[in-house]
């Protein structure tokens, strides 16, 4: 549902002449929620918490950043965003995420929506974000868990 993924999808659809096809949007494929780090660039984050800690948060499988508290500058803008009026439920809305938590968020959509359509023989384009895609890749190949922090995703259309 985030703008970058939507723009990427529109570019792809235009290029392949499929601009009128149905599009499903879900918060479950959003980028990882960096919690209290949201809105800070890498330099600011490193100055406040130290470069080593920032790398742990960014690349660790199961270590989340600090949570986004209700007094955070962007809390209301995110939690009350009209795109999320119906989904996720308030108790499901993440306040922070590790890669592990991101996977737990993406897999219900993968298993419940994408896989059934693939089994029906449908062609699917997934326009999402790096960490949500990393989570799906990890699910597809559990051997990657030990090197997940080194995984860069490349997308190519032929």
Roles of regions detected by a PLM:
Residues 1-76, 84-85, 96, 137-158:
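Phosphate-coordination/substrate-recognition cap region in phosphate-metabolizing enzymes
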Residues 75-105:
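A contiguous, well-structured pocket-lining segment that forms one wall/lid of small-molecule binding clefts
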Residues 6-7, 93, 100, 104-158:
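Active-site-adjacent alpha-helix immediately C-terminal to a catalytic or transition-state-stabilizing loop
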